Curated annotation (Swiss-Prot):
InterPro entries: SCAN_dom, SCAN_sf, Znf_C2H2_sf, Znf_C2H2_type. Signal peptide: none annotated. One of its GO terms (biological process) is telomere maintenance via telomere lengthening. This is Zinc finger and SCAN domain-containing protein 4. The gene is ZSCAN4. A zinc finger (C2H2-type) spans 309-331, 337-359, 365-387, 393-415. Residues 44-126 form the SCAN box domain. Residues 164-185 have a biased composition (Polar residues). Disulfide bonds: none annotated. It is found in: Nucleus; Chromosome, Telomere. One of its GO terms (cellular component) is transcription regulator complex. Embryonic stem (ES) cell-specific transcription factor required to regulate ES cell pluripotency. Binds telomeres and plays a key role in genomic stability in ES cells by regulating telomere elongation. Acts as an activator of spontaneous telomere sister chromatid exchange (T-SCE) and telomere elongation in undifferentiated ES cells. Residues 1-38, 164-196, 224-257, 281-300 are annotated as: Disordered.
């Protein structure tokens, strides 16, 4: 997005252009947050202008983009540094580097929208590595970035399929900017933050050679085990501009809202109900490929990830047995990690460590309204919302708002469970 913003609109509007007068813009009123939300809504509604007549469509689109960015950035109110800082933060979130957009925006507002102060409080905990997706199509397979458009994935696998024929040529590794990636299976360097592999079929509307609709088996991959986390989230609607593995048109990508732990890829419950394929445990996820020797080493690298483990009580899938056992403790309510001071039990050691900070005497963060102290700044921010009435966590499916992220995540899990119940009642896709 940053490169697109280099287009300059500082030139004088043409007198012969009947639409050039629309480039004048008055400063918008109201809170900055409300303006930003209205701006993105305005952008979505203006996409229909692309269907207008050929002689005015491009000009009208540029005028609308100018109004959009002028309303958002407000150059008459903010300095160049403030505008650049705002664009840097937005690009940072669009690239999928943040694990929790809401928390990042809270820190941004708390810093007074000052980039230097914001970076001082920013930690690597807010970062997440880009996810990789293991894709099977008609005997071909590869690892792709979750941000790579589905059309590009199909094009690459179609080329790889033609390589398997006697007349084929050497297989090419696709490149895609800005995320730049398709990695062969087993060569991923980043890994995925998911606790396990999510398996589902997609029959996309994009047709391949011969007007056949390719069938894809997409598996969420990971390169290293991580303890199961309790948070779930769906995509923030503001990140819909980001390209990714999703439906054609918008090409929605990785789950953006806040972090996408234990939630299947884009589309919401409607998409889940038509894409998930349930199978008994354990689930073999690796499909054996046939062809020339160029795929022999490829199979060897996938051999260690040949089996996955499915929970018997819910449709979640885990690559490692240890992750499955940790997950099953939640179903059985086995809180094996106990606090020595208050005897409260927890499912994971990491949860216990976070809890033990509550018993620490040091509580440097104090509420300016009621003078209640907290050991963590995030707890203070959540507490202050009680006084302000702010509810920043809004569900994109039912538009209910919540004050705390934990309540919001619990609500999202209810949506997820409803989607899985709908899947279990439908016949298995062929």
């Amino acid at each position: 997005m940053a490169s697109d913003l280099r287009i300059s609109f500082q030139g004088e509007p043409s007198r012969n252009d009947p639409g050039s007068e629309n480039l004048e813009h008055k400063p918008s009123q109201g809170p900055a947050v409300q303006e930003e939300e209205e701006t993105y809504e305005f952008l979505r509604t203006q996409l229909s202008l692309l269907q207008n007549s050929n002689n005015s469509c491009a000009r009208q689109e540029l005028q609308n983009l100018y109004k959009l960015f002028h309303s958002w950035l407000q150059p008459e109110k903010h300095s160049k540094d403030e505008i650049i800082s705002c664009l840097v933060l937005e690009q940072f979130m669009i690239n999928g580097h943040c694990s929790d957009r809401s928390m990042l925006k809270e820190k941004w507002n708390a810093s007074g929208r000052n980039l230097e102060k914001f970076m001082e409080d920013l930690t690597d905990e807010s970062m997440k590595p880009p996810g990789l997706v293991h894709v099977h199509m008609q005997g071909q397979e590869a690892l792709f970035s979750e941000n790579m458009p589905l059309k590009e994935v199909i094009v690459h696998l179609t080329k790889q399929l033609s390589v398997g024929s006697p007349t084929g040529t050497d297989m090419e590794t696709p490149s895609w900017t800005p995320q730049d990636t398709s990695l062969e299976t087993g060569q991923g360097e980043w890994g995925d933050k998911e606790n396990g592999d999510n398996i589902y079929h997609i029959n996309d509307s994009i047709t391949s050679q011969g007007n056949e609709i390719p069938s894809l088996l997409i598996i969420r991959e990971e390169d290293y085990p991580r303890p199961e986390e309790d948070s779930v989230s769906l995509k923030n609607p503001l990140s819909s501009r980001k390209a990714g593995l999703g439906m054609s048109g918008s090409q929605e990508g990785s789950l953006k809202g806040p972090s996408y732990q234990d939630v299947l890829m884009e589309g919401g419950p409607g998409f889940l109900s038509q894409s998930i394929q349930v199978s008994p445990e354990p689930v073999p996820t690796h499909q054996r490929t046939e062809g020339n020797s160029t795929r022999g080493g490829h199979q060897e690298r996938c051999r260690e990830a040949q089996n996955s483990y499915r929970c018997e009580k819910c449709p979640k899938i885990f690559r490692y047995f240890s992750q499955l056992k940790a997950h099953q403790r939640r179903h059985n309510n086995e809180r094996t990690f106990t606090c020595a001071e208050c005897n409260r039990g927890f499912f994971q050691a990491s949860d216990l460590h976070v809890h033990q900070k509550i018993h620490a005497e040091e509580k440097p963060f104090t509420c300016s309204t009621c003078e209640k102290s907290f050991s963590h700044k995030t707890n203070l921010l959540a507490h202050e919302r009680i006084h302000t009435g702010e509810k920043p966590y809004e569900c994109s499916l039912c538009h209910r708002s919540y004050r705390q992220s934990s309540t919001y995540h619990r609500h999202l899990r209810n949506h997820q469970k409803s989607a899985f119940r709908g899947v279990s009642s439908t016949p298995e896709a062929s």
